[in-house]
Regions:
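Bacterial carbohydrate/catabolite-sensing allosteric modules
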Residues: 1-10, 24-25, 30-37, 41-238
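Intrinsically disordered, low-complexity polar regions and short flexible loop motifs
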Residues: 14
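Structural motif corresponding to alpha-helix initiation and N-cap regions
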Residues: 19-23
């Protein structure tokens, strides 16, 4: 383990970028050494972390889709064990419940743990092959969204005229090709900088907040549009 370098005094502290749930094994390290969780974190371990509010971000995406008139909204999630993934799923489900819409198991797909383009592509094709197909796809990462757009287009669907696609992260690729992707922007640079600031404070024996939540932004672009009845909508134009 790289964390073993702390015990060997080969490092003075650590920033963790991919902490999964059930990470209690980290606590003994954090009790002896300065450690900060950055972006991904386990809320059940007492280790400083900095992130965005993935639950609220998912609610913001869903509110956007609902405001556009979408009712058949699918989620392309992941098989990983990140807290952010769980919170985006919860935000999706809670938004449906608050809108009086059913949570349809057939509208939820779990892509690979590493958010690959191909898994987004395959998930979108699976979702859009249903007779009562969804009219909007909420993808928990931009790479999944880019794959979903490619999958939809290969099937003959137009984005956003026939199906809306929304991502998460705001990576550079979302504005390289049309349609530009509607997505949640995470302040990745600020997250990294704040994590380093927190680590520096811990390394110097100073008190720090246990959690820091930085603001996100919903970037509304070309891949999302109002629900309307088009030539490919016959089974689900309700």
């Amino acid at each position: 383990l790289l964390l073993g370098r702390l015990s060997l005094h080969q490092a003075d502290g650590a920033i963790l970028l991919a902490t999964e749930l059930h990470a209690q094994w980290l606590e003994p390290y954090a009790q002896r050494h300065p450690i900060v969780q950055s972006s991904e974190f386990d809320p059940d371990v007492d280790i400083v972390h900095v992130s965005v509010d993935s639950y609220q971000a998912a609610r913001d995406v869903m509110n956007h889709l609902l405001s556009l008139g979408h009712k058949r909204i699918a989620l392309i999630s992941s098989e990983n064990r990140y807290y952010s993934t769980a919170m985006r799923l919860k935000g999706y489900l809670d938004a449906l419940a608050d809108a009086g819409l059913p949570a349809t198991p057939e509208y939820i797909r779990k892509a690979t743990v590493d958010y690959t383009f191909k898994s987004g592509f395959n998930s979108a094709r699976s979702l859009l092959s249903q007779e009562a197909r969804p009219t909007a796809l909420f993808c928990i990462s931009d790479m999944l969204a880019l794959g979903a757009i490619a999958g939809a287009q290969e099937m003959g669907f137009r984005v956003p005229e026939d199906v809306t696609v929304v991502g998460f992260d705001d990576v550079e690729h979302t504005t390289m090709f049309h349609p530009y992707v509607t997505t949640v922007a995470q302040p990745c640079f600020d997250i990294g900088r704040r994590a380093m600031e927190l680590l520096y404070e811990l390394m110097n024996g100073r008190e720090t907040p246990r959690q820091v939540v930085l603001p996100h932004s919903l970037m509304v672009r070309e891949s999302s549009a109002a629900r309307h009845c088009g030539f490919m909508d016959f089974p689900v134009c309700v």
